[in-house]
């Protein structure tokens, strides 16, 4: 873009130095002061943990902590996803997120209770019916080394599509979880039936889209999503129960 503007003899986009100075002398100084105070208070009993969090160094052995599902498991992939997410979040203090007022339906729920002014260590965020803001907030959390997830019905992905696109462009590992992935949602009617949405999000650059066929593929999807560091993942899950397909091919989910 810079080269194109030069070729067109256009003025370069610039910010006056006094604007930089103003922000450095106000917001930056205030932020640094608050950060030092917070770090001093919090690290008393959690020095090692806080260092790992700030450096994004927490790694999980997913094969050890996540279960496999046998042929008797016959549930929606949203339910399998909810149980897997709970295990991952319990074992990784970086995982934080929530839904656009649909947590009970998408079953994408954070741990340590709701985040609030009274519970700032809570890792479930009630974003409200604000899909676009939810995606933007989640991307901001990813910039600061946390492992955010956000969730809504798949038919509503259009409301947060710009956030997914920005995550791809910015190489952020935000996890977008969508449930109610087909016309099988039934009684909700055509407003809740995703038709063209899958094609749309699959066309977004640098975004992985996984629509697992059963619980074991769902496990692989979550392993992939929470292992990546340079691109977002969309996990598309079902409302209706799906049979577990006993196969060794679920490990090939990462191949697309």
Where are these regions (language model features)?
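Thiamine diphosphate
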Residues: 25-236, 240-247, 252-255
């Amino acid at each position: 873009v810079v080269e194109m503007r030069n070729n067109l003899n256009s003025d370069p986009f610039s910010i006056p130095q006094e604007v930089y100075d103003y922000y450095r002398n106000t917001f930056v100084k205030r932020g640094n002061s608050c950060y030092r105070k917070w770090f001093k208070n919090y690290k008393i009993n959690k020095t090692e943990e806080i260092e790992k969090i700030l450096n994004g160094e927490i790694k999980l052995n997913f094969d050890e902590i996540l279960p496999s599902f046998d042929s008797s498991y016959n549930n929606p992939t949203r339910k399998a996803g909810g149980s897997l997410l709970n295990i991952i979040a319990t074992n990784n203090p970086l995982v934080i997120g929530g839904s656009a007022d649909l947590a009970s339906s998408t079953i994408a729920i954070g741990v340590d209770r709701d985040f609030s002014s009274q519970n700032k260590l809570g890792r479930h965020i009630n974003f409200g019916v604000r899909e676009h803001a939810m995606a933007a907030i989640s991307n901001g959390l990813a910039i600061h080394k946390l492992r955010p997830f956000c969730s809504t019905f798949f038919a509503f992905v259009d409301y947060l599509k710009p956030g997914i696109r920005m995550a791809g462009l910015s190489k952020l590992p935000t996890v977008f979880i969508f449930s109610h992935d087909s016309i099988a949602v039934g009684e909700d009617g055509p407003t809740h039936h995703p038709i063209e949405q899958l094609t749309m999000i699959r066309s977004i650059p640098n975004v992985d889209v996984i629509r697992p066929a059963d619980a074991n593929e769902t496990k692989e999807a979550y392993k992939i999503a929470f292992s990546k560091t340079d691109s977002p993942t969309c996990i598309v899950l079902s409302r209706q129960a799906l049979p577990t397909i006993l196969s060794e091919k679920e490990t090939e989910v990462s191949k697309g």
